[in-house]
């Protein structure tokens, strides 16, 4: 089941999901929590942060955070997509990204951009983006640090 309205309890849930993955630094997971706070305080439209949650048997097991890119006509960023490690590789991520794409399209969005790390740890993530129809648009070498490129993917809706 999917829902797009965050609750106050979702902040700790998404931090738990991110921590379970082993992909993110603590300062990164805190940012995700702050985006929920922004959404709850200002609303999705004013904050620019929309959410999609995947719930399974009453438990949130994955989420996306996305929003329009300022000063563009119809481009959106996918800021976050994560699935709890116990539910990875079960198709939940694919369903989450498809539901997110539907919402972006319904809002008039025509492109979604995703940024991720070029580190080896993220190889499966980059493969996931390719499998779900995203194209590698650019690589910014050593962006995050030596040997850690920023990989930018795009999908036309």
Can you say where each PLM-predicted feature lies in the sequence?
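Active-site-proximal loop/turn and secondary-structure-junction residues that shape catalytic pockets
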Residues: 82, 118-120
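Conserved GNAT acetyl-CoA-binding A-motif
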Residues: 104-117
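Conserved catalytic-core motifs of GNAT/GCN5-like acyltransferases
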Residues: 115-118, 130-151
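Acetyl-CoA-dependent GNAT
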Residues: 4-79, 84-86, 94-99, 103, ...
